[in-house]
Design a protein with these regions (language model features):
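Post-HExxH zinc-binding segment in Zn-dependent metallohydrolases
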Residues: 93-120
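Active-site scaffold of zinc-dependent metalloenzymes
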Residues: 39-71, 84, 88
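Short histidine/acidic/glycine/proline-rich micro-motifs that form metal-
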Residues: 8-10, 68, 91-92
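Non-transmembrane alpha-helical segments in soluble domains
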Residues: 21-25, 78, 102, 106
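Hydrophobic or amphipathic, alpha-helical segments that drive membrane association/targeting
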Residues: 1-8, 12, 36-45
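Zn2+-dependent metallopeptidase catalytic core
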Residues: 11-33
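Short alpha-helical catalytic segment bearing the HExxH-like zincin motif
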Residues: 72-80
Length: 120
């Protein structure tokens, strides 16, 4: 289940967000039944484009900087969704998590954009 919150300046109509989350769930089955909230917020003072939190009910909150361009937004959301997948699959080591997320974010971003071009 997907929820959105915050001050949306990137993808205000969620024309990329919803298809991207669906596409990622097709790539990683563990995401299919996850409860995820995407919160666009000004992270300018945080020195980060995004970060992911999980609560005691195993519900995920992804904060994403709301001043990214659409390409940065997609790459960042993919990175954070990889962290959701990792948590669901029990991968908890920080370095291992970041290594995987950074190594997969750009290839997955390119695959997502390619899949969008074949639809139109």
């Amino acid at each position: 289940m997907l929820f959105t919150s915050g001050d949306w300046y990137v993808d205000t109509e969620k024309e990329i967000t919803y298809p991207l989350v669906t596409w990622m769930a097709e790539q990683f089955a563990s995401l299919k039944d996850a409860t995820i909230e995407i919160n666009q917020v000004d992270l300018g003072d945080e020195f980060a484009y995004g970060f992911c939190q999980v609560d005691e009910d195993n519900e995920f909150l992804i904060h994403i900087h709301n001043r990214l361009n659409i390409e940065e937004y997609v790459t960042t959301l993919i990175h954070e969704l990889i962290h959701v997948k990792q948590t669901l699959e029990g991968m908890l080591g920080h370095d291992e998590r970041e290594d995987e997320a950074y190594s997969k974010e750009l290839p997955l971003s390119n695959q997502f954009w390619d899949s969008r071009q074949t639809v139109h």
